[in-house]
């Protein structure tokens, strides 16, 4: 039997770079919220112990894909602790709607959905804490998708505190370029010393993203989309880009602006949600 699992997008409602560690990783403070929009992952169990991704991503080797890596990591971890039946495997396919290099967390969300779904389907019985710890080895954003609640993140993104920001409507736009994260983080002009503040203080301040100035400087497409959106509503970069978003109080307001968008702007309207669609589907 084939089962389907949501793999939602996320937005960074704000993102501040507070420092850089000796190992090169940047410390940050950011606010994650999910969208009721994303990819869909389909899973069909196998009994021969094999993991097969039926919808390969162009330019990504099978074993390098985060979906396959997540499945194999769970398989090994559960098997090593005697919590996996012999022969457990899976055919996995994905209906991909989220762009790569968009700052919407697509790959991390895919990995988290696979961890949560296969833990359930294989009846491994691993806790969310265990799954989140495994997820962190796959990517800094994976744990928030595993835990499934909007969160304030610190450290390199792994220290999570659940929060409940307002669930607004967003017009999310893709400028048509992909921005590799290192391009932003290696830029010498990236702000790296934004003062650390408490969650309470940050939630009262106007939200912004320290990466935005670099993305706008290096990618004229990002600058053009943001300039257009800012004529209608508060708008920011999410993550390190390339996607940007404008926030609205109602769905109709967001859709009215999208209808006016120039032909070169690709976008969609989605609601911000504090409980991940993946976890909502499991209730």
UniProtKB/Swiss-Prot annotation:
Name recorded for this polypeptide: 4-diphosphocytidyl-2-C-methyl-D-erythritol kinase
The protein's assembly and partners: Homodimer.
Keywords: ATP-binding, Isoprene biosynthesis, Kinase, Nucleotide-binding, Transferase
Active site: residue positions: 10, 141
PANTHER family registered for this protein in UniProt: 4-DIPHOSPHOCYTIDYL-2-C-METHYL-D-ERYTHRITOL KINASE, CHLOROPLASTIC
SUPFAM superfamilies according to UniProt: GHMP Kinase, C-terminal domain (SSF55060), Ribosomal protein S5 domain 2-like (SSF54211)
Gene Ontology MF terms in the entry: 4-(cytidine 5'-diphospho)-2-C-methyl-D-erythritol kinase activity; ATP binding
Reaction(s) catalysed (UniProt annotation): 4-CDP-2-C-methyl-D-erythritol + ATP = 4-CDP-2-C-methyl-D-erythritol 2-phosphate + ADP + H(+)
Class of enzymatic activity (EC top level): transferase
GO biological process, one term: isopentenyl diphosphate biosynthetic process, methylerythritol 4-phosphate pathway
Tree of life domain: Bacteria
EC annotation from Swiss-Prot or TrEMBL: 2.7.1.148
Family to which this protein belongs: Belongs to the GHMP kinase family. IspE subfamily.
Gene3D superfamilies: 3.30.230.10, GHMP kinase, C-terminal domain
Protein biosynthesis keyword on record: no
Physiological role: Catalyzes the phosphorylation of the position 2 hydroxy group of 4-diphosphocytidyl-2C-methyl-D-erythritol.
Span of the signal peptide: none
This protein's encoding gene: ispE
Keyword Manganese: no
Pathway(s): Isoprenoid biosynthesis; isopentenyl diphosphate biosynthesis via DXP pathway; isopentenyl diphosphate from 1-deoxy-D-xylulose 5-phosphate: step 3/6
Residues at which ATP binds: 99-109
InterPro entries per record: GHMP_kinase_C_dom (IPR013750), GHMP_kinase_C_sf (IPR036554), GHMP_kinase_N_dom (IPR006204), IspE (IPR004424), Ribosomal_Su5_D2-typ_SF (IPR020568), Ribsml_uS5_D2-typ_fold_subgr (IPR014721)
């Amino acid at each position: 039997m084939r089962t389907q699992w949501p793999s939602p997008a996320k937005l960074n409602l704000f993102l501040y770079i507070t420092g850089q560690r000796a190992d090169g990783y940047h410390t940050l403070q950011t606010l994650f919220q999910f969208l009721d929009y994303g990819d869909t992952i389909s899973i069909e169990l196998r009994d021969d112990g094999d993991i097969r991704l039926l919808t390969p991503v162009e330019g990504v080797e099978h074993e390098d894909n985060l979906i396959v890596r997540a499945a194999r990591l769970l398989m090994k971890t559960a098997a090593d602790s005697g919590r996996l039946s012999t022969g457990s495997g899976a055919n996995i396919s994905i209906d991909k709607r989220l762009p790569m290099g968009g700052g919407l967390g697509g790959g991390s969300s895919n990995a988290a959905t696979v961890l949560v779904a296969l833990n359930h389907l294989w009846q491994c019985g691993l806790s969310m804490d265990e799954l989140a710890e495994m997820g962190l080895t796959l990517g800094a954003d994976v744990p928030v998708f595993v835990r499934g609640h909007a969160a304030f993140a610190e450290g390199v993104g792994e220290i999570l505190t659940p929060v409940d920001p307002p669930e607004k409507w967003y017009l999310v736009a893709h400028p048509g370029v992909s921005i590799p994260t290192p391009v932003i983080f290696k830029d010498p002009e990236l702000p790296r010393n934004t003062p650390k503040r408490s969650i309470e203080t940050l939630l009262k301040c106007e939200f912004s993203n320290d990466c935005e100035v670099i993305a706008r400087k290096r990618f004229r497409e990002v600058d053009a989309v943001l300039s257009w959106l800012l004529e209608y509503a508060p708008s920011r970069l999410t993550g390190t880009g390339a996607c940007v978003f404008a926030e609205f109080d109602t769905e109709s307001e967001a859709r009215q602006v999208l209808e006016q968008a120039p032909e070169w702007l690709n976008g969609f309207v989605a609601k911000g949600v504090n409980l991940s669609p993946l976890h909502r589907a499991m209730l």
